[in-house]
């Protein structure tokens, strides 16, 4: 019988906290939530589309949470500005960690957390939300195998139409606006396809029509690399919403086009693949690849963390990739 991991869920304020706690409720064979730390007395900006449900769990103060030493893993789900402060505490203690994103408005605090986890040999999993996406994994493996040749362009968007006026103002509380908050998910994905250091980054930061000047809810960023380009964008007033989000990757021998990026309406997630040459059982031409029916955005990633902590699989963290993703994210603040 596999060990259930004693789990501290630190924070209720992150936008993903309601979804993460809901996923953990389903994974009782892997995780035993011993406490939820209530961070709501803090004043850091935050926004929730869904309420946080701590029913059935012991809710403790932050000071009480920090006194708890007998835990196997911590989920850091505070407001964005507080993530690295809490992550550093548990990295220094050598506790396995899932920490949500983004990783702060500077590189230094995040690099310190990474260095501590490396030195102590404990897992640090960042909550970029497409890491367990089956279509993204298919693309990553196919690109690595050379199916679509050398990558020349990659683009993605995280447009949406949810959130009231307070959400629009929330985007203005971040130096990098909506794209700092959401674009890091896209950069985590696209950086797997476009390698190297950008020679130039052009960022457009604006507001949707009718919104006030303090709002940063219409943004794009164009990254130029030797031999390739990358484009990410996000607007919170795009009526197509989540079901029109897209990732497209163009190579010298083919293209991947994923739209929507994810879906939880019971329908199949489908990836369009166009090949110039036959590969591994696929003929040249256009293919619609079924990636199955998604039921949970986060479960796959955090189940993997449980297996790593128990020693069932090797640690899958690629710290150099993660540091590069954060460096690309910080370009949005310039």
Model-derived regions, located:
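N-terminal Rossmann-like dinucleotide-binding module
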Residues: 1-53, 306
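Contiguous beta-strand/loop segments that form the cofactor/metal-binding neighborhood of enzyme cores
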Residues: 3, 181, 187-265, 292, ...
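Beta-loop-alpha module in the N-terminal Rossmann-like domain of NAD(P)-dependent dehydrogenases
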Residues: 50-116
């Amino acid at each position: 019988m596999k060990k259930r991991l004693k789990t501290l869920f630190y924070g209720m304020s992150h936008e993903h906290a309601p979804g993460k706690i809901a996923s953990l409720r389903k994974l009782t064979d892997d995780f035993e939530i011993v406490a939820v730390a209530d961070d709501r007395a803090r004043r850091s900006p935050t926004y929730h589309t869904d309420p946080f449900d701590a029913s059935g769990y012991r809710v403790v103060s932050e000071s009480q949470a920090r006194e708890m030493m007998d835990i196997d893993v911590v989920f850091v789900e505070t407001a964005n500005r507080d993530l690295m402060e809490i992550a550093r505490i548990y990295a220094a203690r050598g506790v396995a960690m899932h920490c949500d994103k983004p990783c702060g408005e500077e590189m230094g605090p995040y690099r310190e957390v990474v260095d501590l986890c490396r030195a102590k040999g404990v897992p640090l999993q960042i909550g970029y939300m497409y890491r367990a996406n089956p279509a993204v994994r298919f693309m990553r493996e196919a690109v690595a195998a050379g199916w679509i040749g050398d990558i020349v362009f990659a683009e993605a968007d995280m447009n949406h139409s949810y959130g009231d006026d307070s959400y629009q103002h929330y985007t203005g509380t971040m130096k990098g606006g909506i794209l700092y908050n959401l674009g890091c998910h896209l950069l985590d994905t696209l950086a797997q396809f476009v390698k190297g250091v950008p020679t130039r980054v052009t960022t457009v930061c604006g507001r949707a029509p009718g919104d006030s000047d303090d709002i940063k809810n219409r943004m794009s960023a164009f990254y130029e690399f030797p031999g390739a380009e990358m484009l990410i964008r996000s607007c919170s007033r795009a009526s197509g919403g989540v079901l029109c989000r897209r990732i497209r990757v163009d190579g010298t021998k083919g293209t991947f086009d994923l739209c929507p990026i994810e879906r939880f309406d019971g329908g199949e997630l489908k990836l369009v693949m166009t090949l110039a040459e036959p590969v591994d059982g696929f003929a040249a031409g256009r293919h619609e690849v079924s990636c199955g029916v998604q039921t949970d955005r986060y479960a796959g990633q955090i189940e993997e963390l449980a297996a790593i902590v128990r020693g069932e699989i090797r640690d899958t963290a690629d710290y150099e990739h993660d540091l590069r993703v954060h460096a690309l994210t910080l370009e949005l603040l310039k």
